[in-house]
Amino acid sequence: MNIKIICVGKLKEKYFKQGIAEYAKRMSKFAKFQIVEVPDEKAPESLSNAEMENVKAKEGQRILEKIKDRDYVYALAILGKERSSEEFAAEIDKLTTYGHSDIDFVIGGSLGLSPEVLKRADTQISFGRFTLPHQLMRLVLSEQVYRAFMINVGSPYHK
């Protein structure tokens, strides 16, 4: 199985990198795990709606270039479906049972994801209505993917 987190922007914070590296190491017995960063589009502080859509479109194109045709894609979106850890684990288990060996998770930049990326996604997932920095979301998502594997093997980690 291959798990890929595709995200906009570079992760600079050492403490986030260390946390993600720890979960990547733990996941290595279950899946190949990788983070793919695409450049964020430089933009001024205040943007018109048209400029915002243009930024999302450019970032979206960069994201789509990293997704293969057969990949199963989760888009992280505030309006996506919330799942419990158990539901998420069951979903991952079901995907692998039905032959989806490449699963991508897409985290947008500060303006969110383009309509094209949302359209390409097989499903949208939400971690709640909170707004979180996308750097932190990488760590939270890494932990939840690891937790899903642990639930699926019956590990006490989830308790």
Swiss-Prot record:
Its EC number is 2.1.1.177. Its main location: cytoplasm. Coiled coil: none annotated. Keywords: Cytoplasm, Methyltransferase, rRNA processing, S-adenosyl-L-methionine, Transferase. One of its GO terms (cellular component) is cytoplasm. Gene3D superfamilies: 3.40.1280.10. It is found in: Cytoplasm. InterPro entries: Alpha/beta_knot_MTases, RlmH-like, tRNA_m1G_MTases_N. It catalyses: pseudouridine(1915) in 23S rRNA + S-adenosyl-L-methionine = N(3)-methylpseudouridine(1915) in 23S rRNA + S-adenosyl-L-homocysteine + H(+). S-adenosyl-L-methionine binds at residues 76, 108. GO terms for molecular function: rRNA (pseudouridine-N3-)-methyltransferase activity. It comes from the Bacteria. Homodimer. Specifically methylates the pseudouridine at position 1915 (m3Psi1915) in 23S rRNA. Belongs to the RNA methyltransferase RlmH family. This is Ribosomal RNA large subunit methyltransferase H. It comes from Lactiplantibacillus plantarum (strain ATCC BAA-793 / NCIMB 8826 / WCFS1). The lineage of its organism: Bacteria, Bacillati, Bacillota, Bacilli, Lactobacillales.
